[in-house]
Amino acid sequence: MEGIFAAYVLPALIIALKSVVLLVVLLIVVAYLLYADRKIWAAVQLRRGPNVVGPWGLFQAFADLLKFVFKEPIIPSGANKGVFLLAPFISAVLAMATWAVIPVNESWAVANINVGILYIFAISSLEVYGVIMGGWASNSKYPFLGALRSAAQMVSYEVSIGFVIVTVLLTVGSLNLTDIVLSQNTGLGTMLGLPASFLDWNWLCLFPMFVVFFISALAETNRPPFDLVEAESELVAGHMIEYSSTPFLLFFLGEYVAITLMCALMTVLFLGGWLPPVDVWFLSWVPGIIWFMLKLCFCFFLFAMVKAFVPRYRYDQLMRLGWKVFLPISLFMVVATATFLKVFGLA
């Protein structure tokens, strides 16, 4: 009996505990990133932003949570009730499930699997189904148009993101996210005789792919200037028009968790994960999770600034950018990287 407990029950309990801790921390982080997003946007527009609930408005996100939870969920009379309620649940759960393999520090992941990046790409590809189901089940034109746009947009930019990831995998030689971070201890900087630093991270040697990944991540998560799925001036709120109360909250949560995931992926693939910017003793003393969170917040700040400054693209411009600009660039970089590694015997 003790052998069964040690072999099966205890590992399952540990994974369940890790998952609960990850979920709680993730929801708190998302709440304050949403607060930061609103504050940054307000500052750009010379407004104060959230400033009533708690000191400096720090508890505004939790007040919004209570507001949504206690509202009555309204289901349109012509909607497919089962699919209508299932769609936001799928969107939120899939977005949170991808975080299981993200290492916020060395050996700090719910599941440190050897195909971590493949797992993320597979799960995130399924998130579009939540949007499509919600748009179709609402039995309304605007949500359906938003869902159709979402399907085309996400599929288009997943291609570019996939080739960016292939380029990183060629340079690292592993699908394990921890290995990808540790490989950035050495790079261009150390080849020039400098100590390990931010010059070794992949953002420098793969800078074109870093830019492609950043812009594609904006499109993949429906962030401005690529928020055609829920364009307020055209579709009011896109696939979420008919949603209210907790179902709307789940869609909104899934969207911001996906944004946070893209920021974390950018940190892991290009910004050295939990590695300090310079390998000196007083920076190495800082816990790796602190560096990871600082880099994640920096990436989110870039997302917020793009939202504040860049006007929305037309739909044809969005598609042209994905298929006629990013796809050729990413394909060329895959071929160029593979050729470079083969010619110089680094493969």
Swiss-Prot record:
EC top class, as a word: translocase
Protein location: Cell inner membrane
Annotated Pfam families: NADHdh
PROSITE patterns reported in the protein's UniProt record: COMPLEX1_ND1_2
tRNA processing as UniProt keyword: no
Topological relation to the membrane, as annotated: Multi-pass membrane protein
Cysteines joined through disulfide linkages: none
Classification via InterPro entries: NADH_UbQ_OxRdtase_su1/FPO, NADH_UbQ_OxRdtase_su1_CS
Function according to Swiss-Prot or TrEMBL: NDH-1 shuttles electrons from NADH, via FMN and iron-sulfur (Fe-S) centers, to quinones in the respiratory chain. The immediate electron acceptor for the enzyme in this species is believed to be ubiquinone. Couples the redox reaction to proton translocation (for every two electrons transferred, four hydrogen ions are translocated across the cytoplasmic membrane), and thus conserves the redox energy in a proton gradient. This subunit may bind ubiquinone.
Entry similarity comment: Belongs to the complex I subunit 1 family.
Name of the protein in its database record: NADH-quinone oxidoreductase subunit H
Source organism of this protein record: Brucella ovis (strain ATCC 25840 / 63/290 / NCTC 10512)
Name of the gene this protein is made from: nuoH
